[in-house]
Amino acid sequence: MLFSSIPFLYTFLPCVLILYFLVPGWLKNTVLLLSSLFFYAWGEPRFVVFMVIAIVQGYVFGLLAEKFRDRPKQTKLCLWASAAISLGLLCYCKYADFFISGFNTLTGLSLPLLHVALPIGISFYTFQILSYVIDVYRGDVTAQRNLIDLAAYVAMFPQLIAGPIVRYADIAPQLKHRTHTLADAAYGARRFILGLSKKVLLANVLYELISAYKSAANVSVLFVWLYAAAYILHLYFDFSGYSDMAIGLGRIFGFHFIENFNYPYISASVTEFWRRWHMSLGSWFRDYVYIPLGGNRVSKAKWFRNIFIVWLLTGLWHGAAWTFILWGLFFAVFLTAEKLWYGQALAQTRFLKHLYVLLLIAVSFVIFDAASVSGAFRTIASLFGLGGLPRSDALARYYFDSYSGVFLVAIVGATPLPAKIVRQFSEDGPGKKIMSVVEPVVLLGLLAVVTAYLVDGSFNPFLYFRF
């Protein structure tokens, strides 16, 4: 089930909210869990089995890891057993055919592919369970003794499908003791509607340009650049829109989820970009892979190793394809180069450093979206006029004229400027009174326009659902 769908907005969500606020406090997590399982089973019920197995083993091994904390060998065995099951399920569902195909290529064999369907959101909930058991093993959190509460944490539908990757430590107190206020509900509704609008009115519209590019028989350099610009903006509004909706829904239910995006396209370095983009994933790899490997407190050779391991895994986390591996290693190379060579030089040239980051982002997401490594290189070559394409053509100029307004809104919307303007108007004074009237009207208007688009529009799932 999609957040940006009529059944979710006008049937599922209202019913869940009514039931959730009718039941007593001790039943709220049960309602949240059952509704989340229904939400997840809507598309493919059999995938619920994988999630239930992952939750139950995390629950059992979390308790055992805590019980045997004074026995290092036993508690470490619990950690590794849980990790093996979690990662085993993930690898079977997501990477089996990739590894079989690679093995066939290396050996010349023809082992049959398994053609395993990928359960939606498995990468997200696997990382949540892994972090929970690791934190119990480290003694950072107390093991959850109530299976329903732990299952509600993992399966909670606001963040189940595409994050943020919520740490158990961040919301453990809220699982038992959380407050529900009108202020939180209003904030949550506002955040949800804004995220929904980003998804439907910007990401979906930009996706139409991307589809036109991919279906065109012939393209020009201008069209390739339009595609690259549309894709990076589409990906941002698609994913950050989902995160906004997840955070908003979580707040309505009394949970305070971490932020996942902080205007990444204003970054002045690749390092800064990854502090602002998909922050929950970046912090997960930092705390559970990079730092345990030694971080930057090791020799230069080991630091290189740590960087490349983290980014190889980051690429693989996004998908079982050589393009994702290349995408991860692409960032590893430029992060390393920034740290060692030209990072200080970038700090001296403000305009050029922003241009540099945007150019690298465009190239990186061309790789990310490519169907093959060779296709990625062809598109990158075309960006720089090396593919033998004409500079422009009638179709590219048509889309440039047609989408110039959308691009303008999207570019401004990807900066802190709109939020800054709203914040200034919302401060004490006449502006605050005006905003108290204007904001609800604008939000209701956005919801009405989004609803009209959804009634008349085509199916367009969130891009990060496939991860």
Enumerate the language-model features and the residues they cover.
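Membrane-embedded transmembrane alpha-helical bundles that form the catalytic cores
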Residues: 1-466
